[in-house]
Design a protein with these regions (language model features):
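Short gly/pro/ser/thr-enriched loop/turn and capping motifs at secondary-structure boundaries
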Residues: 22-23, 47-48, 66-70, 129-131, ...
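General beta-strand structural signal in soluble alpha/beta enzymes
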Residues: 15-17, 41-43, 60-63, 89, ...
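Short helix-loop-beta junction
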Residues: 7-16, 231-237
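Terminal amphipathic helices with adjacent charged low-complexity linkers/tails
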Residues: 14-88, 284
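Active-site diphosphate/adenylate-binding microenvironment
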Residues: 90-150, 159-162
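Thiamine diphosphate
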Residues: 133-267
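Ferredoxin-like iron-sulfur electron-transfer modules
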Residues: 91-105, 243-261, 274-291
Length: 291
């Protein structure tokens, strides 16, 4: 909203951009408002900041001018605050749609390539590996919420809707620690024979490379106990636990065939560090020869 306001008003207005909204900086707000003639609080959805500013005894405009629903844009601010439509530059060339994809060199690519090649039904989860659902891999068939990959697959296998002989759950290492353990526990407890793949890239990739219980470091980067996924799965009662490098496509396919053929629950830990980690050595580069 700050950038939108700057683009609409330019140098004709003063701006206070709040970097922290809880607690709100009373002194800073009072100081800024004392230097201007009129205060307009530009915030999306509920008037949280506006209500707080008014509680300080400061008169301001906000939701009496701006909508409480949907996202703001330059067009919305210009229409509501200046009563005019902004001029847009027409672009004659059609810009191609570029949906997000897994990073070049991402270890999850090998995993999803093997799953796609084998035409396995994949119950997905929430993480950067969710992008395995996007073209050209298009390997993920369902995604609901954190932990739902395992519990969802277990339910589908138990109900007879999807055969456990050709279906897997894919969940990341940090998401597994967050809300996947109980789902795997239920598979064992309910005598299921589902196959679960833990995509272990040694970090929490989707939200900015935060540490997690499996990395051996706290969020501050301090050394700590690293959760051993193999031992945890064994403690839950999983007898068939494999660790496979997803870049080794042949081994991944062989491991998948073996796990899917078993009449017991199986776990495959697809382990290779995220290619964006600083400590990962990039010792082999490949380019596309367009000729």
């Amino acid at each position: 909203t700050y950038v939108y306001a700057k683009e609409v008003f330019g140098e004709n207005a003063s701006y206070l951009k709040l970097g922290l909204v809880n607690p709100l900086p009373d002194k800073l707000i009072r100081s800024f408002c004392a230097e201007v003639e009129r205060v307009i609080v530009v915030e999306e959805l509920d008037p949280v900041i506006e209500t707080y500013v008014k509680s300080l005894g400061i008169a301001c405009d906000g939701k009496n001018l701006l909508p409480e629903l949907s996202e703001f844009s330059q067009e919305v601010l210009a229409k509501c605050l200046l009563d005019k439509q902004p001029e847009f530059v027409a672009i004659e060339d059609e810009i191609p749609n570029r949906p997000p994809v897994l990073c070049p060199g991402c270890p999850h690519r090998g995993l999803f390539f093997a799953l796609k090649k084998m035409k396995v039904t994949v119950s997905g989860d929430i993480g950067c590996y969710t992008l395995g659902s996007a073209p050209p891999l298009s390997a993920v068939d369902s995604t609901l919420c954190m932990g739902a990959s395992i519990s969802g697959l277990h339910g589908m296998n138990k109900s007879g809707g999807i055969s456990p002989e050709n279906s897997v759950a894919v969940i990341g290492d940090s998401t597994f620690a967050h809300s996947g353990v109980t789902g795997l526990m239920n598979i064992v407890y309910n005598k299921g024979i589902s196959t679960v793949i833990i995509a272990d890239n040694s970090i929490t990739g989707m939200t900015g490379h935060q540490q997690n219980p499996t990395t051996g470091k706290t969020l501050k980067g301090e050394p700590t106990y690293a959760l051993n996924l193999e031992k945890l799965c064994d403690a839950l009662g999983i007898k068939d636990v494999k660790v496979i490098d997803p870049n080794d496509i042949k081994s991944m396919e062989e491991g998948l065939r073996d796990s899917l053929s078993r009449k017991e629950p199986s776990v495959i830990i697809s382990r290779r560090p995220c290619v964006l980690l600083k400590e990962v050595k990039k010792d082999a580069y490949y380019v596309i020869d367009s000729d």
